From Swiss-Prot:
Substrate binds at residue 128. Involved in the ornithine fermentation pathway. Catalyzes the conversion of L-ornithine to D-ornithine. OR could also racemize basic amino acids such as lysine and arginine. Serine, asparagine and alanine could be also converted by OR, but at a lower rate. Its cofactor is pyridoxal 5'-phosphate. Homodimer. It comes from the Bacteria. The modification N6-(pyridoxal phosphate)lysine is found at residue 35. The active site is at residue 35. Gene3D superfamilies: Alanine racemase. Optimum pH is 8.5. This is Ornithine racemase. The gene is orr.
């Protein structure tokens, strides 16, 4: 059935191994981020043999699905108070930035007779999660170390995801300095200094990843074969692991300019149309509800995506060398947004090759 995402599992496994080896070259361990695939068990179990330190996801529901796999589990998103019991049950380690949440995790861990490991997040300017002021961080560390069922395993930072701040040697060196200060002041080991995500990968090849960084959380680079600070492909990696295949449900020649007064579309946007005369247009059975249309790229480079509503994708096929007909399949490469939404959609099948 269509639409469907195909996954070349051998290429994905090769990418995961490449990332693990690259991180080792940079002197750090790897957490493979599987959230963009909704931690699809059939896929992630194929990566278990790569033997990285952690599988990482933002949703505890996804980590719960992976409980039978040997690789440890890392919760990326700082926990909600309503899920602390599940966090202790299904995550080997979680990222945190709120004392009240850590107290709740401690209580849940005590009830479950477990010690829960945590990474304390530091904000170095991207302005998402983490302690921003050094004194605030240290005052909270004083309280956290009193929690008998919580073990501080390390500190971490998020960069690029919200504020688009690019990881550099100087800001990641600051993270290492903070770790050293905490080790000295509080007699902590802090084996994990997590220096960000796929946007930090480029520093390894440049030889600029600080020695004190011991962990990277890598998702997009593994999936799409590129670093995310500047969007460059990584030589030696596969960038065609995932493809989206959609079926044509209508194929007709129509004017390129809508007829009548133009208002706003289904999403409140006022579209712009260029008058190119009569064009052959294919309607595909997929839409904005299913994926991020803006990050789809047709394999047939003679095709042009014109736009989409909730359930329909309109493609100009006039210039293609292929004579398309109703029922034919059009294949797309997928960017990060398309992949993320596509895996989340229950209306798109997933097929391992």
């Amino acid at each position: 059935m269509y639409p469907k995402i195909t996954i070349d599992i051998n290429k994905l496994r090769d990418n995961a191994t490449f990332i693990k080896n690259l991180c080792e070259k940079g002197g750090c361990k790897t957490a493979l981020v599987v959230k963009s695939m909704c931690a699809n068990h059939d896929i992630v179990k194929e990566l278990d043999s790569v033997e990285v330190d952690y599988f990482a996801d933002s949703r505890i529901q996804n980590l719960k699905k992976l409980k039978d796999l040997k690789t440890k589990k890392m919760l990326l998103r700082i926990p909600m108070l309503c899920e602390v019991e599940d966090v202790v049950k299904y995550a080997d380690i979680s990222m945190n930035s709120e004392l009240d949440t850590l107290k709740a995790l401690n209580k849940a861990a005590k009830t479950l007779n477990k010690v829960h490991s945590v990474i304390i997040m530091v904000d170095l300017g991207d302005l998402r999660e983490g302690y921003f002021e050094a004194e605030d961080l240290k005052e909270n560390i004083k309280e956290i170390i009193k929690l008998e069922n919580i073990e501080i395993k390390g500190i971490g930072v998020n960069l690029t995801c919200y504020g688009a701040v690019i990881p550099k040697n100087d800001n990641l060196s600051r993270l290492c300095d903070i770790a050293d200060e905490l080790r000295t002041e509080f007699n902590l080991e802090l084996p994990i200094v997590s220096g960000g995500n796929s946007s930090s990968i480029y520093l390894i090849d440049k030889g600029e990843l600080p020695e004190g960084i011991t962990n990277l959380r890598v998702g997009e680079s593994m999936l799409l074969g590129r670093e995310t600070a500047y969007g460059e492909d990584i030589i030696g990696m596969n960038n065609d692991v995932f493809e989206l295949k959609c079926q044509i449900v209508e194929l007709k020649e129509k004017p390129s300019l809508p007829i009548g007064e133009i208002g706003v579309d289904a999403f409140g946007n006022k579209p712009y149309y260029e008058d190119k005369g009569i064009r052959k247009r294919a309607i595909l059975a997929i839409g904005q509800q299913d994926t991020d249309i803006s990050s789809l790229m047709p394999i047939d480079d003679k095709l042009e995506i014109l736009g989409a509503s909730s359930d329909h994708l309109i493609v100009d096929v006039s210039d293609s060398n292929t004579s398309y007909k109703v029922g034919d399949i059009i294949t797309f490469r997928m960017g990060y947004g398309a992949l993320l939404k596509g895996f989340t959609s229950e209306y798109i099948e997933k097929e391992l090759l």
